[in-house]
């Protein structure tokens, strides 16, 4: 079993708004650095584009269509040598509602 000094915490973040995602990444990295852990990142991952094609008219006109898209921005942050203070500070961190967070130990 690995000790706390050899462990790594990997945090994956997803959001539709890039600015909201970047501010959340800054908060996590600042919190990790304040508790004497080593934070590497945020590492940007490829942005996923999802395009939806919708008919403009509710009736016959099939030639008239409209396209909508959603972009999902993703980041990874690795935290090396976390202490119990680091984990407690990350648990108490208040992040915006539009950011999905996945934590792996």
From Swiss-Prot:
GO biological-process terms attached to the record: translation
Keyword field contains Ribonucleoprotein: yes
Keyword line: Ribonucleoprotein, Ribosomal protein
Gene3D superfamilies attached to this UniProt entry: Ribosomal protein S10 domain
InterPro entries: Ribosomal_uS10, Ribosomal_uS10_CS, Ribosomal_uS10_dom, Ribosomal_uS10_dom_sf
GO molecular function terms noted in the UniProt entry: structural constituent of ribosome; tRNA binding
GO CC field: ribonucleoprotein complex; ribosome
Function: Involved in the binding of tRNA to the ribosomes.
UniProt similarity note: Belongs to the universal ribosomal protein uS10 family.
Assembly, per entry: Part of the 30S ribosomal subunit.
Name the record gives this protein: Small ribosomal subunit protein uS10
Source organism (scientific name): Crocosphaera subtropica (strain ATCC 51142 / BH68)
């Amino acid at each position: 079993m690995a000790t706390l000094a050899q462990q790594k915490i990997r945090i994956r973040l997803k959001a539709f708004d890039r600015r909201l995602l970047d501010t959340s990444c800054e908060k996590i990295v600042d919190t990790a650095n304040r508790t004497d852990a080593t934070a590497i990142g945020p590492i940007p991952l490829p942005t996923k584009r999802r395009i939806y094609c919708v008919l403009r008219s509710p009736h016959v006109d099939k030639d008239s269509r409209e396209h909508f898209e959603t972009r999902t921005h993703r980041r990874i942050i690795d935290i090396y040598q976390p202490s119990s203070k680091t984990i407690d500070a990350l648990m108490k961190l208040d992040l915006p509602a539009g950011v999905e967070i996945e934590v792996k130990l």
